[in-house]
């Protein structure tokens, strides 16, 4: 299947503005959209849209949204780019967590809470700034609040659910709208020796009956996108146990205030925000 990438680079503010426009416009299409810092000194960021087969149609839509001629297009070899990119990924440290691929087991140090996640079909290896920030808040929250159960909403690779389980042997529900992600999540939980603590389910939002069996939750973590987080604010609050904590990520710096306001409207209190590589992770109670 032919794969193409539409890409555009600009300063941080313009790149974030463009990313936000495209992320909202293509939310229902399923096209992966990424924003990456490519020049740290000059603060230049690149926005990419990955498409299959219909690159010309998508390019026309992009031109209509952000202006003609801004994005270039390149054809990509027909390979699994996420898996292929693992070769260039370095292990990530977030608090005491050490997230690594199978090729970096030799880099685990004494005292590390090691989580092995190979890049593949599900998003979330720990190499993304928003995931790293979330891991830091998870460590702090679990160690200070001692939750008795947890929910990882939009689990992806299950890196966050695994992190919770490595800190506390509590029941954890890990859900995702993508059945492939749910399969990968279960495999990763088993690989990391915490499968007995993590129950996985394919679910969109909170509509699945499994939530009735597990809620309310002392800890809810959700590393998805800003717009779904805002829409889900009432449901997330509804499924939170009294005195519980919520950790949100998948949020750009520029989206922080809107997401925070949605949860403060639900009566939640802002505890902390971590900023990592242009992304934020938010802790509320």
Curated annotation (Swiss-Prot):
It is an enzyme of class 2 (transferase). S-adenosyl-L-methionine binds at residues 131, 154, 176, 223. Keywords: Cytoplasm, Methyltransferase, S-adenosyl-L-methionine, Transferase. It catalyses: L-lysyl-[protein] + 3 S-adenosyl-L-methionine = N(6),N(6),N(6)-trimethyl-L-lysyl-[protein] + 3 S-adenosyl-L-homocysteine + 3 H(+). One of its GO terms (biological process) is methylation. It is found in: Cytoplasm. Its EC number is 2.1.1.-. One of its GO terms (molecular function) is protein-lysine N-methyltransferase activity. Its main location: cytoplasm. Signal peptide: none annotated. One of its GO terms (cellular component) is cytoplasm. Methylates ribosomal protein L11. Belongs to the methyltransferase superfamily. PrmA family. NCBIfam families: PRK00517.2-1. This is Ribosomal protein L11 methyltransferase. It comes from Brucella abortus (strain 2308). The lineage of its organism: Bacteria, Pseudomonadati, Pseudomonadota, Alphaproteobacteria, Hyphomicrobiales.
